[in-house]
Amino acid sequence: YKDMNPDNWIQANFHAHTRQFGGLTNGRVNTNEMLDSAYSALGFDYIGISDYNKINYYDSVNPSFIPTYEHGYGIFKIHQLCIGAEKVRRLDYFAFQNLSMKQHTLNRLAKQTRLAIPAHPSFVKKGYLVEDMKYLSNYKLMEVLNGFRISTAHWDTALSNGHLVYLIGNDDSHDVNDITYVGRRFTMINAPENNPELLMQALENGNAVGVDFSVISDE
């Protein structure tokens, strides 16, 4: 954190879904406008859309736009959040994935995207295993904080086995009408400007912190 400036904070969420493919995928409730409006109202500086296996160009006129999508078709939710993607990688392992398959996917994605991030590692028991994190490499960040899961055991295992991996936090919003799942988990990035290159550099260098707000049941 030695290069951090306490005056330069960008509030960001990179993981959220909108209606795509005729409403086939989860996120069908959200329109681009709804998602943008909800996060703008909460003061977010960077509002990312990460639709399943598709780059959403709704906000591409914004100078801070970073092409992003969530990769993965498999039934065990072994997904990757791809930030700074050049294109969408269509291939994936649909059913069971062993360690070599998971590593192969990360390696292939790394050739086509700036940041290929294991998403919600603890989402299902047969997805990313805690044991996997002893060996998996070729990624710089892990989505430790996710609106559905917190994966500190996965992160701790990666760090304890010599993998320098930084944290990222996201809502993984699928329905902005449910305010209890909007603005709960996100990333504060220490960067002088809301600029794609500066944001990604800061994430790569660990100049960011994850934020987790607890839900208060009687709010």
Show the residue positions of the predicted features.
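A metal-dependent hydrolase metal-coordination microenvironment
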Residues: K2-A119, Y128, Y135-S137, L145-T157, ...
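Generic structural signal for residues positioned in beta-strands
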Residues: S64, H79-L81, L141, T187-N190, ...
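Structural recognition of alpha->loop->beta junctions
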Residues: E131-I150, F186-L198
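Residues that form generic nucleotide/phosphate-binding pockets
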Residues: R108, A158, A202, G206
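C-terminal functional module detector
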Residues: Y1-N5, F21, S173-E219
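A short helix->loop->beta-strand "cap" motif at the edges of active sites that frequently abuts
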Residues: F44, N161-V165
